[in-house]
Amino acid sequence: MEKHKNISMAVIKRLPKYHRYLEELMKNEVDRISSKELGEKIGFTASQIRQDLNCFGDFGQQGYGYNVKELYTQISAILGLDRGYEAALVGAGNIGQAVSNYSRFENLGFKITAIFDANPKLIGMKIRDVEIMDIDEMESVLEEHKIDIGIICVPRKNAQVVADELIRGGVRAIWNFAPVDLVVPDHVKVENVHLSESLLTLIYLLNESES
């Protein structure tokens, strides 16, 4: 994957949406699309789309628009989807099981190869053919396998300890579902998924629309 520096986080967070819509267009056998048409589907302006894509290169042709398949391939490469990623999930409760069971991740080259939990009732069970292991085995498993991403689905009181152990095991990216902000070294990237914050935002918008 080619490195792109000084790209704003706002632009980066819009790329997955472009990727998803382009995939839908390919499934519908759409060969090309203009920035205006793409913007109408996604909810962005044509100017915004052109500015975002120009951060990564010269895409599209004036008077022609974008070749859907080519743009999808290019955005896939920008996102790093031209290689596979192995993940370890810690916490096989309701959220952990839901994440583990989501089949679309494998289509993106993202595979959960290890699942850990401290609950004896869960240890030995399988989720999509991956056996849940005792969390005490995590250190040795991380030593034996190259795990790219750690997924934290444990209670907040345990999240930092789990993050520390994942990092010691060589994990450089963490997808955090625990309702706590983790403290990690600069070289480790964290993406938080705080469900309650998303719900509170929705509740605010609901009340604003009714006032």
Curated annotation (Swiss-Prot):
Residues 17-56 bind DNA. SUPFAM superfamilies: NAD(P)-binding Rossmann-fold domains, Winged helix' DNA-binding domain. One of its GO terms (molecular function) is DNA-binding transcription factor activity. NAD(+) binds at G91, A92, G93, N94, I95, G96. It comes from the Bacteria. InterPro entries: CoA-bd, NAD(P)-bd_dom_sf, Rex_DNA-bd_C_dom, Tscrpt_rep_Rex, WH-like_DNA-bd_sf, WH_DNA-bd_sf. GO terms for biological process: negative regulation of DNA-templated transcription; response to redox state. GO terms for cellular component: cytoplasm. It holds the Pfam family CoA_binding. Keywords: Cytoplasm, DNA-binding, NAD, Repressor, Transcription, Transcription regulation. Its main location: cytoplasm. SMART domains: CoA_binding. It is found in: Cytoplasm. The keyword Cell wall biogenesis/degradation does not apply. HAMAP family: Rex (MF_01131). Modulates transcription in response to changes in cellular NADH/NAD(+) redox state. PANTHER family: REDOX-SENSING TRANSCRIPTIONAL REPRESSOR REX (PTHR35786), REDOX-SENSING TRANSCRIPTIONAL REPRESSOR REX 1 (PTHR35786:SF1). Homodimer. Belongs to the transcriptional regulatory Rex family. This is Redox-sensing transcriptional repressor Rex. It comes from Clostridium beijerinckii (strain ATCC 51743 / NCIMB 8052) (Clostridium acetobutylicum). The gene is rex.
